[in-house]
């Protein structure tokens, strides 16, 4: 079966590697154009491009797939199926129609829950107890196609987006190759999604990481895990230099207790953690990153930054 692969980040490269390991016939690889990265802002190839070139696979990097010329180039590859994993470009219907067996997408959620750009983060943010990957037959709509197969995994109480990402990174490739071995069979039993049960995982922004201390401690703690490694949950202190007053929270936990102090007020600082009042409950910060520094445990922070983390002071 002639496979065209489309993907960009490391998550996608893991799936391409699985196809190559199992000797599938990959006839072409699509990935986003090289983007400036690093301090020098030099154009850098994607993880998928690097892997494809290592295996002497033809690489295509169109800015979009809307032009007739780019669509003709894809058609010339005569694909039986196109596998799409975190590609980052929308595929017009004309592209979806080119492979004889259509286009398959590996999506990091249990569809129809968390269609969209940030399914891993939103699952933790919302307090979901499980996640997984779906192999979906692509349609013109955003993650709306029928589901051919799903694999589930539990979301642990201390799960971060980084750790859940790695779980799905191992589930996805196995699920994909399982489907490809009996594609006709899986397609014949594909299950339509229920639009009524759909939720949308909107893209994260840096501003969303700003902690609102009037929110419940349980919600803030989920945000700390959901937004790690990006955009990170963060707050500010008026006791740090203006313009360099952002504190990134890497880890936190819920503790029992209550206080009549206002949200954002620090009520206790020990080597175990920095206890902050929220709109409902107490949040203990156990690891944070000061401006220009690496992440540090609370035991280091309370000694080195008593001007920021002493009881009675506030975080904004």
Swiss-Prot record:
Domain of life where this protein originates: Bacteria
Protein name: Methionyl-tRNA formyltransferase
Xref: Pfam families: Formyl_trans_C (PF02911), Formyl_trans_N (PF00551)
Catalytic activity: L-methionyl-tRNA(fMet) + (6R)-10-formyltetrahydrofolate = N-formyl-L-methionyl-tRNA(fMet) + (6S)-5,6,7,8-tetrahydrofolate + H(+)
Entries under PROSITE patterns matching the protein: GART
Segments crossing the lipid bilayer: none
Family of the protein in this entry: Belongs to the Fmt family.
One Gene Ontology term of the molecular function aspect: methionyl-tRNA formyltransferase activity
Taxonomic source organism: Idiomarina loihiensis (strain ATCC BAA-735 / DSM 15497 / L2-TR)
Lineage of origin: Bacteria, Pseudomonadati, Pseudomonadota, Gammaproteobacteria, Alteromonadales
Gene3D superfamilies (alphabetical): Formyl transferase, C-terminal domain, Formyl transferase, N-terminal domain
CDD domains: FMT_core_Met-tRNA-FMT_N, Met_tRNA_FMT_C
UniProt-listed SUPFAM superfamilies: FMT C-terminal domain-like, Formyltransferase
């Amino acid at each position: 079966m002639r496979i065209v692969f489309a993907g960009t980040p490391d998550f996608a490269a893991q799936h391409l590697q699985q196809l190559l390991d199992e000797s599938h016939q990959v006839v072409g690889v699509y990935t986003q154009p090289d983007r400036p990265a690093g301090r020098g802002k030099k154009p850098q190839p994607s993880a998928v491009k690097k892997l494809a070139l290592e295996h002497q696979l033809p690489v295509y990097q169109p800015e979009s797939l809307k032009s007739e010329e780019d669509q003709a180039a894809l058609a010339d590859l005569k694909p039986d199926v196109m596998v799409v994993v975190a590609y980052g470009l929308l595929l017009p219907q004309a592209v979806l129609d080119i492979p004889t067996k259509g286009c398959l997408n590996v999506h990091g959620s249990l569809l129809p829950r968390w269609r969209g750009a940030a399914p891993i983060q939103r699952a933790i943010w919302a307090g979901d107890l499980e996640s997984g990957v779906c192999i979906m037959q692509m349609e013109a709509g955003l993650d709306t196609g029928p589901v051919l197969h799903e694999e589930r995994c539990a979301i642990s109480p201390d799960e971060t987006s980084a750790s859940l990402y790695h779980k799905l990174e191992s589930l996805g490739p196995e699920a994909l190759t399982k489907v490809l071995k009996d594609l006709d069979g899986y397609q014949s039993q594909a299950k339509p999604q229920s639009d009524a049960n759909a939720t949308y995982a909107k893209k994260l922004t840096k501003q969303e990481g700003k902690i609102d201390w009037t929110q419940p401690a349980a919600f803030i703690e989920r945000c700390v895990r959901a937004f790690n490694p990006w955009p990170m949950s963060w707050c500010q202190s008026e006791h740090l230099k203006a313009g360099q007053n952002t504190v990134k929270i890497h880890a936190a936990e819920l503790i029992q207790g209550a206080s009549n102090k206002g949200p954002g007020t620090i009520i206790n600082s020990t080597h175990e953690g920095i206890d902050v009042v929220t709109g409902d409950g107490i949040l203990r910060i156990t690891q944070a990153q000061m401006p220009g520094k690496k992440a540090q445990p609370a035991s280091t922070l309370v000694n080195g930054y008593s001007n920021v983390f002493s009881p009675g002071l506030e975080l904004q």
